[in-house]
Amino acid sequence: MQFKTIFATLAAFAAVASALPTSSSEQNGNGQCAVGQAQCCSQVQKQGKDASDALAGLGLAFNQILDGAIGLDCQQIPVGVLGGAIAIQNTCKNTAVCCQGSANNGLIQTSCTPLSIN
């Protein structure tokens, strides 16, 4: 009886742990985003005071908890570029990132991580 209780508890912990987000890269290893959309942003600010200052400079207050960096003035990177037909460096002269969300009608991209452009 005790074995069943211990096993059920361990199985529950394993299920919860596997559902939690990880801090691993959001890329699939070939310059494409596994999660979110590839964006080319004129500014990328790390989470914290820099991000808050950048938003305040735009006259915006952002009350959400930010996970990752924020991207400002971003454009989606075309699929042909992500497929390797055109080098990302030729299309994105600023910072390429993978972002999972957006706010203020797309003005701000949220939960961004750098996109490898090897």
Swiss-Prot record:
It comes from the Eukaryota. Disulfide bonds join C33-C98, C40-C92, C41-C74, C99-C112. One of its GO terms (molecular function) is structural constituent of cell wall. CDD domains: hydrophobin_I. Its main location: secreted. Disruption phenotype: Reduces the formation of aerial hyphae. Does not affect surface hydrophobicity. It is found in: Secreted; Secreted, Cell wall. Filamentous ascomycetes and basidiomycetes generally contain multiple hydrophobin genes. In contrast, hydrophobin genes are absent in the genomes of the yeasts Cryptococcus neoformans, Saccharomyces cerevisiae, Schizosaccharomyces pombe, Kluyveromyces lactis and Yarrowia lipolytica, and the dimorphic fungus Candida albicans. These organisms have probably lost their hydrophobin genes during evolution. Mycosarcoma maydis does have hydrophobin genes but the encoded proteins have been functionally replaced, at least partially, by the repellents. Self-assembles to form functional amyloid fibrils called rodlets. Self-assembly into fibrillar rodlets occurs spontaneously at hydrophobic:hydrophilic interfaces and the rodlets further associate laterally to form amphipathic monolayers. This is Class I hydrophobin hum2. The lineage of its organism: Eukaryota, Fungi, Dikarya, Basidiomycota, Ustilaginomycotina.
